[in-house]
Amino acid sequence: MKRTLIVPLVTNGNSKVFEYNQFDCIINCVDAVSSLEISKFDEIYFILNKQVAQPWRLEEKISADVTRLNHIHFSFIILPSMTDSPAETIYKALSVIGWDDRCIFIKDGDNKFALDSTPTSGNYIITSSLENLDRVDPKHKSYVKTDEQGFVTNCIEKRVISDKFIAGGYCFRTAHMFKEAYEALKNYNNTFYISDIIYWLILNKDEKFLPVEAKDFLDFNI
């Protein structure tokens, strides 16, 4: 079974993720994955949009920085147009990568965190606590609620239902399950989030997702 890391970078024209950070002049999207155990993955895909990638020569810039991460195999998928949501970005990327039984780990490009162990199988949501942040804008985050066994029972955008927010990392046991959920939700709404994908799978397919606590969470947008 392949293990694939997917890093969606530009959606709805948001290009802030490509500013150089103040720490070590590595492009933020590369810094975003640098604390993960990337050697566990068979491949890494950076997802770009043509409108931003070409004029800024992003493939060239990102490639130069990725080579510092110890000989990983990486590729770019250049989407022809902007997408309406992160979920659509992943769906279009997987249409190129393939709808199979590979495990996919989705990592947002606008933050950084470390994990005790990076999951490469099963269903997981990377979370952190509002209490761990010195500065936070709670309105712009997604939140999860868990049951007594620790499984996620609800995840929702922009509404605080617990102190646990989604830290920008998601592991799905197969790419195909993401496809099934996306196409089901697409019948009802054109714009939805990865958290909606997860909630649909919990409700309709009895999939179990476990939260994994992020360490040293850093939001590049704050």
Q: How should each PLM-predicted stretch be described?
A:
Residues 112-188:
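Conserved core of the sugar-phosphate nucleotidyltransferase
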Residues 73-75, 151-154, 208-210:
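Conserved beta-strand segments of alpha/beta enzyme cores
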Residues 53-59, 63-146:
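Conserved beta-loop-beta/alpha segment of the NTase-like Rossmann-fold superfamily
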Residues 25-32, 89-92, 197:
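Well-ordered alpha-helical segments embedded in enzymatic catalytic cores
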Residues 5, 163-222:
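Conserved alpha/beta core of the MobA/IspD/sugar-nucleotide pyrophosphorylase nucleotidyltransferase superfamily
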Residues 42-44, 102-103, 208:
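Residues at the starts of beta-strands that form the adenosine-phosphate
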Residues 1-55:
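N-terminal glycine-rich phosphate-binding loop and ensuing alpha1 helix
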Residues 47-49, 77-81, 212-214:
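Conserved beta-strand termini and adjacent loop/short-helix elements that scaffold enzyme active sites
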